[in-house]
Amino acid sequence: MAIHPSKGTGGSKQSNSGARFRQRKISVKQPLTIYKQSDLPTLNASNDLEPSQIHHLNSNANQQQRDIHAIETGVDKNEEDEVHLQQVINAAQKVLLGSQNEDGDKKKDDSDKKTDASVYIPTPDASRIWTDASKYYNDKSFREPETYIKFSATVEDTVGVEFNMDEIDEEFLKNKLWKNYPKVKSPKVKSEKLDDTNKENDNARKCSEVEFEIICDKLEKIIEEKQPFLSMDPSNILSFKELSAYIIEEFNNSNKDKPYVQLGSNLKYISTTALKEKLSKELSFEPFVTLFDKSLLDQTSTNIVRPIPKLLELFGEPVYEHWKYRKIERKGKQIHPALKFEDPSANEKDNDNDPYICFRRREFRQARKTRRADTLGAERIRLLQKSMHRARDLVMSVCRRELIKLENWETDHAIFKLRSDAKNLKRVVGVKGDDFLFYPHKRKKIIKVKEEDEDKESSKIKRDKRSRFDSSREGSATSMPGSATIGTNAINKDRLANGQVHHTQEASSSSQPYVKLPPSKIPDMGLVTVSLVLKEKNETIKRAVLEKLRKRKEQDKDFINVTDDPYQPFFNIATNTKFKNNELKHIPYSSIAATSFHEINTTNYISEKLKNLLEEGKKPLPGTKTFRGSNGELIPSKPFPHLSALIQDRIDNSQFNSVSYIAQLLSNIENNNFSAYNNGYGQQQQHQHQETNRDKTKLSDPIFRLRKRVGRFNRNFVDRRGLMKRPNDVIDDFLKFDDEGVNDDCDQMDVDSESISKNNVPNVYDSRVDEIKRLDSRWQFDNDLTEYDKGLQSPFSLDPSRLNCISDDTQSIRFGSMLLSKSYDLLRDSVHQRQQALVQQARMRTLQQQQRNNKQQAAGQSSGSSSASLGSNTNSNSSISGQADQGQTNLTNSGITRQGGANVNGSQTSTTNNTRSSVSGGSMNPKLPTQSSQRSNTNSPLLASQPQGYSQQQKFNKIPPTSQSQSQSPTHAAGQLQTSKMYNKHGSNITPSNLKGPKFTPANNNQIGGSLPNRK
């Protein structure tokens, strides 16, 4: 690949453009132009340089303009200052300049030409053959493989052991290790019987160089993992026992079930030996050999490496001492320094500034961005990993199958050898018969049921029948004259219908699991019920259990179970006496407290008959016999006096024979004794455990407790706890009052007997019984019992709040707030329902009232209006207009009832008018502002807050239309006006000035009645 040189020659423009040129690194994404030789300019025959080099020299010499596609010398900028490279460039530049000055200066000396021609970049000469190669590489056992590609392993997988021996290690191996180790005498056997797989021969074999490197490599890896900061104090290195224990543990803990998972330090051992060990363990096959290994037929080969536990056992200690000496000498660092690479987790500047990093990257590190394509890429990587796992599983299963086949062939070969030897021995002895044992029998072939073929045959038969039927129908249709077209059309329709039915049947069979059969093909079977199926299932289970019990009984025949753990152990639940300071009042509400309260003892159950036999120790056990030592006769067994001594603690121990919790509970239920729920189960068990706990010393329990506290007015109080206990029995006997004692107390009072017989209520302050009860009530609130004793008396507390350690005051507040919130919710729901019902009733009434008003207005327009009583009506109208701003106006005497309510929102008005047919001979104007805005608001707070007032107004509205006197005085009508109060939803009064909507003002008095004149 070459690039055209620049065509320009010198100039200011060229220098300016050259200064603006910016070099870019070669990118893989951008294409590069490739020129052929014919595209390049012709060169002189004496010039041996490439066009790109000539262009580079021209640009450097004359500072000409660089071409965009100009290529450098192929060397980095920081490496262009290398000595040999500069010499070659300078020599080439001299040659180029000499050829440009009219074919060079012919006066140049021959010596300069020779020196320029001798300048070159030194490279190793690979054309020669090394004669001493056979001296150092004398490995004749290596065989060149047919193909070099054997498996897709990386370089790290085939690199082998990372530790390499040097001269010091080689001297130690030859002078010390080979002479003194292994310390096992080699077996004196013939060379013909020498076998490499023999354990004794493995122990006698010397340590090879590869094995020495493996041991040192393991020590290096383990010490790097366990002591990463060993360079701080090299003398504090781990001992050989600790390191060998870590190495052997890692060797034994290979995960066979999950071969893809490599945890911990297993990732560091990527080598051929590690792969062989892992695969040999997974396949349980040794030795694991690859195609790159040497031939196993070569006895001198050192390829067979013993496992690391064996190497540590034979050569571990001396190799460890040698390695430790070199490790301390290196001050805790690696014995052989390794190359330093870029740290991907470190900062890019740190990697760039570190001078010891080799093999730096030339491309830029791209910044990671979270994009949507990352999820797709991750999913594809997961699928690829799954497919690789499947491929690996397939390969491993194939390997296991081949190993099983190999084992089968080896066993067949061994059987054949044994048969041949037995046949020869049979011939020598002269035994005849049993010849069928000396030849392999033919194995029966497994006949597979070919269901698919049968299905195919049945489908073919059905198709043939269908085709015959169609052909017969076609023949019958064509034989009839004049019906050929009709027959063909019918056949085509039938075919289409059959095809559609066939397709629908196929679709239904693919979607539904059930097939609908015609009644003729349904088999005659009885209906199987669920109860019958369950009954058969239970019977089979019972039969299986009985069969197992029968077999077990036959096995245990003539045996008596006197073991410590029989088949059906006996459970005894008692109160736990170990935990005395625990809170036991919330046992029914907490499983944790119940586990600490009850103590379960498992014992064995010994029948009374067996107990008597063991206690007597005279009679032999029934059904047990022994063999006599003299003649082997079977005689009845002698008694076992020592057996009763062994089980004596089980028989006499009252702790195991005490009444259990379940037995006590059942007896209480039978006797209707439910005092244990109030008094506690501990009182019943307390008497049983008194004898057992009498001898036990209670060192941890204090005698009593005192507490000093300061009360009001700086008074000191001393509270005692545990000083005295309530005498329950004495107080209970003392509190048992007879009728005579009560009567005696009553006689002492200054009350007549007649009043006593009438009232039968004694005076509280004079009654002796009440005084004693009040005295006893003090013990209930001032008790010296401990929490454990309280728990024994009343373990089943009636207060569930004690489970969460909540005080009584807090619990009462919580309970009251809960009831209040619940009642508030119920009240709110009921009020809401009541409001909806009232609003619905108001809607119905307004609709009815509108209908009545329309009828009355139609009747009023037809009748004439009289002007006799206009003067009296004007006074009443003025009074109405003066008080209409308050929201409601009722005129009961004049027969007019007008109720107007303004909404708080100011948008709607609910008004109910119940008018008479005639008002003083006049008619009502239908264009009143209250009537024009006559609507029903469902969210009206006026209706919600005044349901009672509304019902009262409705009572007044239901006045029947009767004739009233037209000469009623205006003062009397004004005196009958009643203004109702209005409230908002918060209960506060609403002033008429705050109401929005239409109002009655004195200015529009002329609009109240159609025939009312203005009053001046």
From Swiss-Prot:
It comes from the Eukaryota. Residues 103-116, 457-473 have a biased composition (Basic and acidic residues). GO terms for cellular component: NuA4 histone acetyltransferase complex; nucleus. InterPro entries: Enhancer_polycomb, Enhancer_polycomb-like_N. Residues 35-50, 475-488, 884-902, 928-956, 976-994 have a biased composition (Polar residues). It is found in: Nucleus. Keywords: Cell cycle, DNA damage, DNA repair, Nucleus, Transcription, Transcription regulation. Component of the NuA4 histone acetyltransferase complex. This is Enhancer of polycomb-like protein 1. It comes from Debaryomyces hansenii (strain ATCC 36239 / CBS 767 / BCRC 21394 / JCM 1990 / NBRC 0083 / IGC 2968).
